[in-house]
């Protein structure tokens, strides 16, 4: 079966930055399962998978424009420390969901300067070329429900990220409307 729109595809993969740093992977015994053609992966990877078949192995370089976008200085802001009410001790690297005019935006603390905190709302892989090594492990027709919802339902789907654009940031919610992540953030796990 060819990979095309409305096909549920299982892939094993590794993704590295242009510097060769491994940022995420899904081994063949725990593949990533997604619905093709519904923007559940970074655009460049989904395009590269189109037309492939089970058993195909390939490598693809995804430019920022078809990955997580360009890095934007406008996404970096200084905010008063007191906006983090309820957090006992702030540390560089902490992740939160910031309430904005456009809705919640994931941010990471990059600097603490007295009573001010610098937060960065860019995706951690923004501005980076990504190098994927991929194998198509399985493919099947999607159910009508999966097509209607735009994502896979089942045992091997990953729902770490509502947008399905690859960042398995995890985290837990605090009562003060921020999300804080103790772990790392890869670009694959949906």
From Swiss-Prot:
Chain ranges of the PPIase FKBP-type domain: 1-95
Its EC number(s): 5.2.1.8
Protein residues bound to Ni(2+): 167, 169, 185, 187
Catalytic activity annotation: [protein]-peptidylproline (omega=180) = [protein]-peptidylproline (omega=0)
Pfam families: FKBP_C
Span list, region IF-chaperone: 76-120
Function: Folding helper with both chaperone and peptidyl-prolyl cis-trans isomerase (PPIase) activities. Chaperone activity prevents aggregation of unfolded or partially folded proteins and promotes their correct folding. PPIases catalyze the cis-trans isomerization of Xaa-Pro bonds of peptides, which accelerates slow steps of protein folding and thus shortens the lifetime of intermediates. Both strategies lower the concentration of intermediates and increase the productivity and yield of the folding reaction.
Domain remarks in the Swiss-Prot or TrEMBL record: The N-terminal region consists of two globular folded domains that contain prolyl isomerase and chaperone activities. The C-terminal region binds nickel ions.
Protein name: FKBP-type peptidyl-prolyl cis-trans isomerase SlyD
Originating species: Haemophilus influenzae (strain ATCC 51907 / DSM 11121 / KW20 / Rd)
């Amino acid at each position: 079966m060819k990979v095309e729109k409305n096909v549920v595809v299982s892939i094993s993969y590794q993704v590295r930055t242009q510097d060769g740093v491994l940022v995420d992977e899904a081994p063949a015994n725990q593949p990533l399962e997604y619905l093709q053609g519904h923007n559940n992966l970074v655009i460049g990877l989904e395009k590269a998978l189109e037309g492939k078949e089970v058993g195909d192995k390939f490598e693809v370089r995804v430019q920022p424009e078809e990955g997580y976008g360009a890095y934007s200085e406008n996404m970096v802001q200084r905010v008063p420390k007191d906006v983090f009410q309820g957090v006992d001790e702030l540390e560089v690297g902490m992740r939160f969901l910031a309430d904005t005019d456009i809705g919640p935006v994931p941010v990471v603390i990059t600097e603490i300067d007295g009573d001010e905190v610098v937060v960065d709302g860019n995706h951690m892989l923004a501005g980076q070329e990504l190098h994927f090594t991929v194998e198509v492990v399985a493919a099947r027709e999607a159910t009508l429900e999966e097509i209607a919802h735009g994502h896979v339902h089942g045992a091997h789907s990953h729902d770490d990220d509502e947008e399905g654009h690859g960042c398995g940031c995890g985290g837990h919610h605090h009562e003060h409307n921020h999300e804080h992540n103790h772990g790392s953030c890869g670009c694959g796990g949906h």
